[in-house]
Amino acid sequence: MHFGPNHLSRFCSALLATLLMAACGEVNDDRIPAVSVNLDLSNQGYWDLYGVHGLGQYRYFIRNAGIPANFPYTALSYTGFGGILLVTDISNSPLAYDLACPVEVDPDVTIEFDTDNLRARCPSCGSVYDVCEFEGSPVSGPAHDNKYALRRYRVIPAATGGYNIVF
């Protein structure tokens, strides 16, 4: 039997997808405590001002620190354990993660997004996470060694044009 370039390409793609699914099943994304998350960006004006609109854009939301400045937090606003990282994935869909590093499990030790490589890094332990393509999976460092992924939050489209971020 002869396998042409198309067959080989399909086989490699299927093999890669299978390996990624198997690897994702082994990752622990529950190290960060489950605390309330509710961020209302459902108003189109709020989304236009505070949302993310393209690959490489990001935003931090930390209610206790007043980040971003002048954001209209309400009594019903909750930004998780260490805050929220809002990014755009490779298909321009918004994704949200807790900012706390799952290795450190400390709300004051937060990951930082790097716009040059589209990954997030913990300045304390050095772990690197893929936040734009593989849903917060660890790429290197102690998080990779221990299979600790970032805690993901749901980003739900709103009827009014923006999004809501919830746990």
Q: What is the role of each PLM region?
A:
Residues 18, 95, 116-119:
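Processing junctions and N-termini across compartments
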Residues 117-127:
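Cysteine-rich micro-motifs
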Residues 143-146:
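Short Gly/Pro-enriched turn/cap motifs at secondary-structure boundaries
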Residues 1-24:
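Sec-dependent bacterial lipoprotein signal peptides
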Residues 128-141, 155:
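Short metal-binding segments enriched for Cys and/or His
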Residues 27-114, 130, 151-167:
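N-terminal pre-ligand scaffold of iron-sulfur
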